[in-house]
């Protein structure tokens, strides 16, 4: 089995530990998962109480010194070692059982379909957490693929950010896109390593 590097940038997020544990516990090949975490928080997670702490490369930054997610993701990239795949996520996610095997198989299938370099990206489904943050309800109301595009007339307009909108793609299969969602990126490290995150953004 090939190795996956999971990049998690976090800013004072109470779900960070749940995210890490969900990824580990639901991975089919747990020994092949490595986490790179940059936590911008007053009180970091307690690594000593995590049974797989040797699989976590961790940096804690005082929130006063925080410079946003791109800065944190840039720092995380320096923690990559000999992994084969790169998964960049937000610090408030839950994972499906066997997600690691599913993603790698899906990536390999897509490679065969388009015969080109690629990244899998998108907005993960939302979920609701209970007060103790140990039970989650996944939003599964819409099951087809939604494409993402720019709003006409709002692309690089002075005084405005480039607004996006989603549209039904009328399929449950993936669609080619022109945008990347920073909260979920999966690819072969061979493709993602030449695209470093700019720590000045």
Language model segments and positions:
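Catalytic cores of eukaryotic secretory-pathway lumenal/extracellular enzymes that build
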Residues: 3-193
